[in-house]
Amino acid sequence: KMTPENLGFNLVWDAETRVDLVDQEMLYAMKKAGCRMMSYGIEHGEFIHEIKGGTATLEQAENAIKWTHNAKIETVGYYMIGLPKETPETIRKTIDFAKKLNCTYAMFAITMPFPGNKLYDEAVKSGLVKLDDAWDQFVYSGVGVGGIQAPVLTTNSLSASDLEYWAKQAYKEYYFRPSYIFNKFLKIRSMKDLKMYYDGFRMLKKDM
């Protein structure tokens, strides 16, 4: 068992999993074994059931984040924007759901249909992929290291510029909430913490 008693030292580690694969007992055991942060692919506030192949629900996502926080483990929630059936209304549901879950950190990515997967094949058939077979378009830059990823997939109701707008809007609404900022200030314990949060907010503001 990976506990300090058995190892003879404190091992700090992070993990990634699905919201439908955890329970309270497991998370408390992981915390005791040194787990610092859990990352979850929550993906969407409307289409989570479809994305996860019918195995995950919004309720499971809520429970997983609540249980993880109760175990004193930080969380990262990953969300997708720009699925083929996406509309401004479904994006709004994703942003609102992300704020409701209130993970320690949230990442919003524009959907990337890599050649060879089901989403790519469907997008090609429906004419939603804007691609000239240049593989450099599949290199993810992300917020903070070059801005929002330029979409290669559009939807029937959202253009590439619309998707970029909504991805930036998601970050703005999530990280610049007064309650989120206040909570981070309460966790500052050193100048190193202050610098880390300051640099993070400055980076986000620059890319918005």
Where on the chain are the PLM-derived regions?
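A structural motif corresponding to the C-terminal lobe/cap of the Radical SAM core domain
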Residues: 2-189
